[in-house]
């Protein structure tokens, strides 16, 4: 694996592991049923995220108005959050399943953004500009260089370096933050903020249009389910030996906020689908050609 050096045949570092294939494939030591449930929920969440984008791809091809239905700021905020999440997952030494999910996020977002610009430029070709190319180039560069960030061994940070910062200080039962993990924690926090902010432009776009036509509800429904399972998979995982539960939650806090924190905003979007459903039905009936008498 690129992001974590593992010796598949060496199970000695996980003496209490109950299922060896989990260690071999994911590098996670499943010591009991909670750890096994964590892995299972994480896998299901990945399938939810993987399936969520396909209905939107199909919807975009059918309606051809994806550039009107989805807010560009929503897509940019989403892909910005996923890019930060990917970098932060490597630097903060997150669970392998978190890293796998982050990689898929970025790839799916790139395809979604490509479809958006395809329909945008199809209608107005002259809008293609250098800033958009720069954004796509930055995202592509992020995907390419992120695996290289994990090749550097973390350097332990002396306790004096965090004097006055109680959350990141080293206390009994706490796993100390390394310099690389601190950077990853900050980037992960930025990704959580971008996730939260990305929903606001889409909520506004739906409100201004008084419609959710052109958007597949399956996109948000499956993302909500995936985020719920993803957050639960992190919460069910046992802390490392000698690490307190508080320290474990602190290390994973940005990713918990990024997954569970957006559920409220996605619920608002779900309500918009219900409220504007009748409007969309009326608009669709008006566009239907009259049957010949």
Curated annotation (Swiss-Prot):
Glycans are attached at residue 10. One of its GO terms (biological process) is L-histidine transmembrane transport. It is found in: Lysosome membrane. Keywords: Amino-acid transport, Glycoprotein, Lysosome, Membrane, Repeat, Transmembrane, Transmembrane helix, Transport. GO terms for cellular component: lysosomal membrane; organelle membrane. Optimum pH is acidic with no activity detected at a pH higher that 7.0. The chain crosses the membrane at residues 38-58, 72-92, 97-117, 127-147, 183-203, 215-235, 255-275. Its main location: membrane. Residues 34-100, 191-243 form the PQ-loop domain. InterPro entries: LAAT-1, PQ-loop_rpt. The keyword Repeat applies. One of its GO terms (molecular function) is L-lysine transmembrane transporter activity. Residues 1-37, 93-96, 148-182, 236-254 are lumenal. A motif (Di-leucine motif) lies at residues 290-291. Residues 59-71, 118-126, 204-214, 276-293 are cytoplasmic. Belongs to the laat-1 family. The di-leucine motif mediates lysosomal localization. This is Lysosomal amino acid transporter 1 homolog. It comes from Rattus norvegicus (Rat). The gene is Slc66a1.
């Amino acid at each position: 694996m690129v992001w974590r050096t593992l010796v598949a045949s060496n199970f000695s570092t996980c003496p209490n592991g109950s299922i060896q294939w989990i260690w071999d494939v994911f590098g996670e030591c499943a010591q009991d049923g909670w750890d096994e449930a964590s892995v299972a929920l994480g896998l299901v969440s990945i399938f939810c995220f993987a399936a969520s984008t396909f209905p939107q791809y199909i919807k975009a091809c059918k309606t051809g108005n994806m550039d009107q239905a989805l807010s560009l700021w929503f897509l940019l905020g989403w892909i910005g959050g996923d890019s930060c999440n990917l970098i932060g997952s490597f630097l903060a030494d997150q669970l392998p399943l978190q890293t796998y999910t982050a990689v898929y996020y970025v790839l799916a977002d790139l395809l979604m953004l490509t479809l958006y610009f395809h329909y945008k430029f199809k209608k107005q070709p002259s809008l293609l500009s250098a800033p958009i190319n720069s954004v796509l180039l930055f995202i592509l560069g992020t995907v390419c260089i992120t695996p290289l960030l994990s090749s550097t061994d973390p350097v332990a940070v002396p306790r004096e370096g965090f004097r006055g910062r109680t959350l990141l200080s080293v206390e009994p039962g706490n796993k100390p933050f390394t310099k690389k993990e601190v950077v990853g924690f900050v980037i992960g926090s930025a990704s959580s903020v971008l996730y939260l902010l990305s929903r606001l432009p889409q909520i506004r776009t739906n409100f201004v249009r008084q419609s959710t036509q052109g958007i597949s509800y399956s996109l948000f429904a499956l993302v909500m389910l995936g985020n719920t399972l993803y957050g639960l998979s992190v919460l069910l995982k046992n802390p490392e030996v000698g690490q307190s539960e508080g320290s474990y939650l602190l290390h994973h806090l940005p990713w918990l906020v990024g997954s569970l924190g957006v559920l409220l905003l996605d619920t608002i979007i779900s309500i918009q689908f219900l409220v504007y459903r009748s409007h969309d039905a009326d608009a669709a009936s008006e566009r239907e050609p009259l049957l010949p008498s």
